Amino acid sequence: MAGSAAKKRGRGKSPLDLGKLKRAMEDCARDCERPLNIDLVIDVTAGDELINCLLEALRTQDPRTQLRCMLLAGELPELPAPCDLCVVAGGESLAVGEVLALAEGLPAPAVLVIEEGETFFAQTPEQAAELVGGSCAPDGSRTPAPVPLDAIVAVDLAASEPLAELGEWVARCAGEARLALAQRYPFCREQVARELVRKTALLNAGVGVLVMMPGADMPVITLNQAKMVVQIAGIYGQPLDLSRLREVAAVVAGAFGLRGVARELADALPGLGWGVKGAVAYSGTVAMGRAAIDCFSEGGTLNSLGAAITRAAEQLATQAQPGTGPAQ
């Protein structure tokens, strides 16, 4: 029954604007293909394991990406512009904060990476934030200039994915370069994809709550979901040439059942319809995004994603039936 109900909800004219979808695909392809200049500044007192881990993660044969390595030993290195990401491997030097300040002045997103639990200049990001940065006076004292805590990442080199926290930082803070970074570097790919899903789901929840005219929210929600799918496809290496426009549109069509659930529940609960629409817009977008991540991370294509999203729509429809709840 849930399957047939989802299919009925999927019928009708698509609210997706193909012209806007075309522009979204062009924008995503451009963002994914952009050249990258990445600076790795290595404090000479940093641990060998940390240095090797960062070098292995950031090296790439991709001709669109240039990795520039430099040492922090006494004098501050010169950071050439443009720079899309500056990673500082921290050791015992307190001058790493000044390197971050130089990078931010380019401007470029900059992060200090330290080993979790190691006794260098700090054992935690909180201690590092209090210590690093500032300038040396003639008497050798330092002028306090703490680095923001969100610019420091502590990594566990014994973990199965030691740079997972760095990947989370890239997803939050790398700005316009994050799609290209995620496409070329596996350590941050899933984190960037999940952040795209989170932001799109929150955006669509707001649309569902605020747009009260029946059906007026559908084109906006649909386009946001299409953009999300396109971006996730791009960072997982799916081709985004315009010959795939119809494929993307067909994939998004598989999510009409997700959006239909919101309409049905809003009609059934008129007093709470605005809240239900927002909640289901959020849940439907999350389900769609997770299906895309799972599909592409396992080597799937846009063609196979359509079936996965249809299954997600049917599952959400089943959970929304009276007397049922979310699957455990």
Q: Where are the model-predicted features located?
A:
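Amphipathic helical hotspot of TIR/SEFIR-family domains
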Residues: 95-108
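Membrane-inserting effector segments that mediate pore formation, membrane fusion
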Residues: 194-290
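Active-site helix-to-loop segments that bind/position phosphate- or nucleotide-bearing substrates
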Residues: 175-192, 196
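Charge-biased C-terminal accessory regions appended to nucleic-acid-, cytoskeletal NTPase
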Residues: 276-328
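A short, well-structured beta->alpha microelement
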Residues: 55-84, 90-97
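Conserved G1/Walker A P-loop phosphate-binding module
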Residues: 3-72, 290
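Canonical P-loop GTPase G-domain recognition
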Residues: 50, 67-72, 119-180
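Structural motif
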Residues: 40-46, 87-93, 114-117
